[in-house]
Amino acid sequence: MAEFDRDLDDELEFKTSKDVDVTPTFESMDLKDDLLRGIYAYGFEAPSAIQSRAITQIIKGRDTIAQAQSGTGKTATFSISMLEVIDTKHRETQAMVLSPTRELATQIQSVILALGDYMNVQCHACIGGTSLSVDMKKLEAGQQVVSGTPGRCLDMIKKGCLRTKNLKMLILDEADELLNKGFQEQIYDIYRYLPAATQVVVVSATLPHSVLEMTSKFMTDPVRILVKRDELTLEGLKQYFIAVEQEEWKFDTLCDLYDTLTITQAVIFCNTKKKVDWLTQQMKDNNFTVCSMHGDMAQKDRDSIMNEFRSGRSRVLISTDVWARGIDVQQVSLVINYDLPPNRENYIHRIGRSGRFGRKGVAINFATNDDITTLRDIEQYYSTQIDEMPVNVTDMM
């Protein structure tokens, strides 16, 4: 059952365009019957705060900037809107979702297929690290929706396999990351291939001012549904730091923490691939069962690790920020920032992995003497407080 924290919904303050109404039920959104069936079968009962505001605006054809916290149903917001708009009688691609990671693109594909189960919708994950010939075959056969990463989608467009002439909607998920330096040019290149009337939807947990400025280049009079930045700390998440003075002490601190806590599932974040590999080996050498993932791994290995972690066969995942955006594993109760993120926007994406949909979660940050300034900067940016971890932290889990 997919549940949202209703108390959290009530507390959200939307800095929203004036003409945005709240639609309190899915029935009152005037959706297709088969789509409604899919929504209820998926486990949704009533729309979350972002869904009750954004879905009807997107369905009207408005360019939309939607910002909401992790765990409030952003993926379903654009998936439901898109499924309402596409015509399943035609096989050509009518909607494209771009995501910053392969895992997120694949997860979005599975949400779209589940919600569109009774509509017989065709949705393909167009991602790097997979067979080009399979991509080409699937796209040639006709896919109403493509969920992919910018590089592979652009490649397929240039090869003439992903045809955009009938595209109605472009969705940028985790837009802050997509529009950052690494993906900006690819996004602009893709946009040049789209029909002039293509509707653009931008969705993200954080939307820095620079990103909002950038969207003005390819959005027309967008409706804005925004959460004020100081509301972006995640309710129900307890945030702590442990002072470790120097880098060399972090590993012993982690082992001590393991002896103290009973962990359902946890994610440990490091800033580099090298550190992920090193820490994974150290943990295994000390008889801890862990798995790890970073961007250098082959796609089939990353898929296999994600499946293990999602199913609960693996309880601890060590990763770089490749995992930090939008991957929903419902049982994650603890996030450890072995390294504080170098980019403060990524902090909320990392800790947003725990306590999703209103469950309680704990985020623990290892802070060396050199990290204290970064920690205070994160506190100030999100108007939040990160306390030193108490001795009785087990009672908080």
From Swiss-Prot:
Its EC number is 3.6.4.13. Keywords: ATP-binding, Helicase, Hydrolase, Nucleotide-binding, Nucleus, Ribosome biogenesis, RNA-binding, rRNA processing. ATP-dependent RNA helicase involved in 40S ribosomal subunit biogenesis. Required for the processing and cleavage of 35S pre-rRNA at sites A0, A1, and A2, leading to mature 18S rRNA. One of its GO terms (cellular component) is catalytic step 2 spliceosome. It comes from Yarrowia lipolytica (strain CLIB 122 / E 150). The gene is FAL1. ATP binds at A68, Q69, S70, G71, T72, G73, K74, T75. The Q motif is unique to and characteristic of the DEAD box family of RNA helicases and controls ATP binding and hydrolysis. One of its GO terms (biological process) is maturation of SSU-rRNA from tricistronic rRNA transcript (SSU-rRNA, 5.8S rRNA, LSU-rRNA). This is ATP-dependent RNA helicase FAL1. Residues 55-225 form the Helicase ATP-binding domain. Belongs to the DEAD box helicase family. DDX48/FAL1 subfamily. A motif (Q motif) lies at residues 24-52. Residues 236-397 form the Helicase C-terminal domain. It is an enzyme of class 3 (hydrolase).
